[in-house]
């Protein structure tokens, strides 16, 4: 079953397949990062590559916790207890636990407390799909990777985040800057990360 949000875009009522796809792309990107890249800057200006890896794993763990009814507010933004060569395994393990936590369809109907408001589980997971994709783009761009984005998943995430985030003057608790203008015909991933406050043309300083 699907619901139409805008012409040409649909949102599935069960966001778990899209989240799984985003998580797989994230894990593949994490596993391709080498130890000598951990110090590099990223488009997410608060984090270098090592910190961004810690944040991604923390996001996966947070999404697991909210499924169990734990408010997302107050969770540590970074995981710091992973060895430099262990990020791929840590990400995979976190995603396995997350998928188990969300296996019951009833979780999609539960109210969940997020930093930016209280949402049903389905809407919360759709929003987190956009966050995972954006941070995967951050990581890939910082380390010279070009992931195989699933345009349907990216477009669905863009619909979800546009529902939740205004273009500018974003409220407290939103971890993204104001939207960056991009052409309407830009690639789906560019439109998503731009809405999340990223410059799609960002590249590391040579």
Spans of model-derived segments:
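Structured surface interface patches that mediate subunit assembly and partner/cofactor docking
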Residues: 2-25, 32-45, 62-93, 97, ...
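Extended, alpha-helix-rich binding/interface surfaces that flank or overlap catalytic cores
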Residues: 52
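Glycine-rich loop at the start of a catalytic domain that most often binds anionic cofactors/ligands
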Residues: 55-56
């Amino acid at each position: 079953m699907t619901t139409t949000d805008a012409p040409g875009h649909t949102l599935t009522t069960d966001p778990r397949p899209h989240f799984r796809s985003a998580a797989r792309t994230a894990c593949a990107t994490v596993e391709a990062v080498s130890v000598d890249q951990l110090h590099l800057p990223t488009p997410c200006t608060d984090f270098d590559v090592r910190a961004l890896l810690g944040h991604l794993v923390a996001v996966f763990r947070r999404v697991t916790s909210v499924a169990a009814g734990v408010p997302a507010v107050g969770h540590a933004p970074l995981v710091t207890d992973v060895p430099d060569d262990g990020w791929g395994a840590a990400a995979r393990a976190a995603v396995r636990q997350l998928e188990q936590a969300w296996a019951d369809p009833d979780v999609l109907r539960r109210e969940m407390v997020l930093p930016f408001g209280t949402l049903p589980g389905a809407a919360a997971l759709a929003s987190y799909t956009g966050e995972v994709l954006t941070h995967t783009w951050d990581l890939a761009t910082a380390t010279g990777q070009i992931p195989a984005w699933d345009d349907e998943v990216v477009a669905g995430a863009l619909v979800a985040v546009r529902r939740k985030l205004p273009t500018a003057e974003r409220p407290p608790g939103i971890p993204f800057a104001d939207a960056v203008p991009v052409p309407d015909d830009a690639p789906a991933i560019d439109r998503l990360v731009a809405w999340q406050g990223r410059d799609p043309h960002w590249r590391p300083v040579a």
